[in-house]
């Protein structure tokens, strides 16, 4: 779209300064701000808190606690994780694989090396695929059940509501918190040695066609909608997170920890336009292959191959 001249660069609009750093990253391609995200969302784990309490467990806050919770539940005959075939695989694999890129030192440098292909993506993502394999090997999730489960479906919700598993992966929105006969809590993914991380995404974008007849009017509308108080109110009405620097969210006590994580920033974007290859869809496809019996080594090698192929197609040629 950029090369064809369909993208109007919003960088000079005053309202762009109102966006949170993570929302801005998700709206920037090759130095151009191509859209105004009207709201923002995130993916996290939703826990059956009552079930954990039955076994004297608390909602985990780091990797060690997470593995202990999973092992204790499994020993008591409970399937810990009710994964689905889509983001229920993608989100934990991305969190376990890419946290180093976004939360370590030198994020921009790492992204550039990945984007140029000087660093193979498997250098990070192998850890993510190994994590998924570990979950399968230890019986913390059922790969066949996962491949049969559609995300955000009634079937997935019923499976969790009937206490067939202890936690699922969900997208943050008002509906996520409704309809359970037990206490729930939505948290970031406690997969790091020293804490948690989540995947975030800009939602409902506004963009401007530079060839529009009424360009000035379109710019005026975007400026008006991009005011902090408008973004905050819009997100509140939708039951989502504001894309403003405030990152306000509806007052849902069960989501305090995941909102705090989003506000902190440096989370993993579901789409990072600084990378000249796909992450979200590819990680989903390769995670499904892993659930079908392919090894972490095989899917990592396949990802490296796709990375190089896509860079040669979409990367910048100097």
Describe each PLM feature range:
Residues 72, 114-146:
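Glycine-centered hinge/linker elements that transmit conformational signals in sensory
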Residues 1-2, 170-183:
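A ligand-binding cleft/hinge motif common to bilobed small-molecule-binding domains
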Residues 32-33, 55, 178-240:
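Extracytoplasmic/periplasmic substrate-recognition and gating elements
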Residues 184-187, 235-289, 312-318:
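Long, aromatic- and glycine/proline-rich binding clefts that accommodate carbohydrate-like moieties
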């Amino acid at each position: 779209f950029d090369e064809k001249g369909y993208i109007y660069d919003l960088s000079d609009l005053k309202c762009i300064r109102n966006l949170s750093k993570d929302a801005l990253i998700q709206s920037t391609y090759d130095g151009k701000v191509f859209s105004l995200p009207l709201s923002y969302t995130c993916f996290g784990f939703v826990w059956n808190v009552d079930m954990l309490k039955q076994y004297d467990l608390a909602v985990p806050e780091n990797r060690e606690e997470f593995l202990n919770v999973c092992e204790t539940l499994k020993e008591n005959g409970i399937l810990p994780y009710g994964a689905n075939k889509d983001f229920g695989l993608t989100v934990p694999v991305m969190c376990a694989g890419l946290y180093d890129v976004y939360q370590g030192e030198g994020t921009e440098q790492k992204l550039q090396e990945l984007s140029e292909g000087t660093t193979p993506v498997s250098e990070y993502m192998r850890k993510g695929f190994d994590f998924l394999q570990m979950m399968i090997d230890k019986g913390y999730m059922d790969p066949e059940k996962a491949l049969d489960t559609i995300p955000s479906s009634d079937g997935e919700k019923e499976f969790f509501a009937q206490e067939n598993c202890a936690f699922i992966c969900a997208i943050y929105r008002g509906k996520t918190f409704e309809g359970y006969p037990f206490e729930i809590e939505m948290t970031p993914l406690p997969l790091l040695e020293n804490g948690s991380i989540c995947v975030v995404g800009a939602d409902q974008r506004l963009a401007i066609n530079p060839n529009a007849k009424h360009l000035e009017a379109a710019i005026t509308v975007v400026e008006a909608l991009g005011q902090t108080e408008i973004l905050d109110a819009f997100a509140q009405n939708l039951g989502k997170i504001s894309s403003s620097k405030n990152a306000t969210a509806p007052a849902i006590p069960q989501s305090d920890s995941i909102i705090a994580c989003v506000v902190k920033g440096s989370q993993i974007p579901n789409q990072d336009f600084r990378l000249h290859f796909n992450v979200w869809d590819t990680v989903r496809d390769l995670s499904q292959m892993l659930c079908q019996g392919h090894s972490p080594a095989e899917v990592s090698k396949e990802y490296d191959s796709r990375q190089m192929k896509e860079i040669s197609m979409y990367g910048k040629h100097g």
